Amino acid sequence: MMAGGNVRFLVLILAVAICGAASVFQPISDSHRSAALDVFVPVDGSYKSLEEAYEALKTLEILGIDKKSDLSSKTCENVVKVLQSSSSTLKDAFYALNVNGILKCKIGEAGPKDIVSQLQAGVKDAKLLLDFYYSVRGLVLAKEQFPGTHISLGDAEAIFRSIKSLSQSDGRWRYSSNNPESSTFAAGLAYETLAGVISLAPSEFDPSLIQSVKTGILKLSDSIQKYDDGTFYFDEKSVDASQGPISTTASVIRGLTSFAASESTGLNLPGDKIVGLAKFFLGVGIPGDAKDFFNQIDALACLEDNKFSVPLILSLPSTVISLTKKEPLKVKVSTVLGSKAPALSVKLTQALSSKSVDSSVINNQELKFDADSATYFLDSFPKNFDIGKYTFVFKIVLDESAHEKVYITEAQTKVPIAATGAISIENAEIAVLDSDIGSVESQKKLDLTKDGAVSLSANHLQKLRLSFQLTTPLGNAFKPHQAFFKLKHESQVEHIFLVKTSGKKSELVLDFLGLVEKLYYLSGKYEIQLTIGDASMENSLLSNIGHIELDLPERPEKATRPPLQSTEPYSRYGPKAEISHIFRIPEKLPAKQLSLVFLGVIVLPFIGFLIGLTRLGVNIKSFPSSTGSAISALLFHCGIGAVLLLYVLFWLKLDLFTTLKALSLLGVFLLFVGHRTLSQLASASNKLKSA
């Protein structure tokens, strides 16, 4: 029997390798919705801050997940508290209004007026870009949520110019006038802020101001980064290392879409960059970080609802086509959030083989449409379509010309495709040859689709030859990614050899005379195993062919010995043996009684010192009598006692570094109080002498 489990594992690994290399972009799907519930998890019915609450609620709202009822109670309490407090920061007020726009919290009548007044004061006093951003965008939110409140910026052009003064010549912006460094992330905030100023202005703006901003946007777009697959993104340079490509690109997209939403701006961006930015966020996959998750979904929502053009994404449920199962090619077209696309047609303009990129196997083939599954498919392939790697080139054509102003697609979408099938294995044989004349001594036909029981014998003067032919379903030569021949000695020593392929024939010749050292001069029975695998090969195999008895010369004394083999092949993955450390045997210690006597001899002088003090008496006449001097002297003696206590602790339990740290602090303390005490004693002595 063939080792089916190993073969299935081999095929799985190869399939994953191909799929992982494919540059295929998928729209937002149920996997994102499932992941969002794991990423945005509230604690006790709320989030740590209103900023986190807004990002979670906004993401879940875009994905169509209703969690408002679970979060509205505690979160609304925080919103009302912030909006009714005069001491709330502009940032807190901004995020409170964002959350309120989703949860529709019940705010008192005085709340809107108070928060509007606070935000208007924030606009007037703002010097930093973030202060302008929070206050202006907060007023825009307040205008949307409180229709009865009149909100406008009387000096809108002056505010616009103040914000514009923070711009740089390369299209990036500064956070403040005192900071010369510019930021791409700040540019996105600035465009959002300027869009808010335009929407709150009581009259039309000076066109030259808007044109100057549009010029800066064009310069900023020149700094956009690009991958080979047509993906575009913005990245921060140096001013704010905490902002990565995801947050920076999301900030710019929010700013551009907000600025373009104003009718007076007339802003437009090239379609290829819109699609490239969408592909960047779709290529991220599912972020594990909550901030990145929010930026991804929010940026895609901005691209899906913008004044430029809505990008359409072509995706494939699978990039592997089985010719054996006659599977059709399936293609889907949708918006970035997975919404239904308008009426259109999909053409397969080219199918380029990796073996011949100059000629196309398929040309201008229009795919059929299945309305029930909203899938475009190609259910038949030309006769010359063989297994292998291809690059399919698709083109999307909108049915109605009016949709061309609303939607945008790539001019060409290139997708790597792997066509798989069953490989024919023919003329498989194994033979023992004489080394001198190359004549066949024994030869066996093989059926590699199943295990065999071939029995061969050879000596060190002979050769072993294995040969077979691999052909595709169309009869073309096939060269597998992996073709290994293994000899396994009865002592479990293994040797692996690579089978080379030339044309249609794969062959391996082992000259045992040149392999005796590699085989460690081990005579005896060797099991023969052949492994053939390829990502395009559906019938990859691991076949046990049989065995061969080898008669090799005796091993010389200086020859390399075979490595020790475990009786259990999988024991290498089990627990390792415990490592036992052998320490140096401690030196012999003196008797306990002798140690105690020695300790007594050391302590004896100290005892004598104490006895002498009791006999002579302690002279404390010079101890300061005034309160300040007495405290300094007392602290000095306490510090000396603390040092002595530290020595004892060092002897008993503390390490050297901890002791030195404590001693340095005590030393500074003793230096201060000791100097003060000595100064006071010297002053008192001088007074006595002068008297």
UniProtKB/Swiss-Prot annotation:
Principal location class: endoplasmic reticulum
Q: Which residues lie on this side of the membrane: Lumenal?
A: 22-593, 652-653
Q: Where in the cell is it found?
A: Endoplasmic reticulum membrane
Pathway the protein contributes to: Protein modification; protein glycosylation
Q: Which residues cross the membrane?
A: 594-614, 631-651, 654-674
Q: Which InterPro entries match?
A: Ribophorin_II_2nd (IPR055375), Ribophorin_II_3rd (IPR055374), Ribophorin_II_C (IPR056790), Ribophorin_II_N (IPR055373), Swp1 (IPR008814)
Its membrane topology, per UniProt?
Answer: Multi-pass membrane protein
Outline which residue ranges sit on the Cytoplasmic face: 615-630, 675-691
Pfam family of this protein, just one?
Ribophorin_II_3rd
Entry's Gene Ontology BP terms: protein glycosylation; response to cold
* Signal sequence, renumbered to the chain: 1-21
Q: At the top level of its lineage, which domain of life is listed?
A: Eukaryota
Q: Name one GO cellular component term.
A: Golgi apparatus
Report the sequence similarity comment from the record: Belongs to the SWP1 family.
The entry's protein name is Dolichyl-diphosphooligosaccharide--protein glycosyltransferase subunit 2
Please give the organism: Arabidopsis thaliana (Mouse-ear cress)
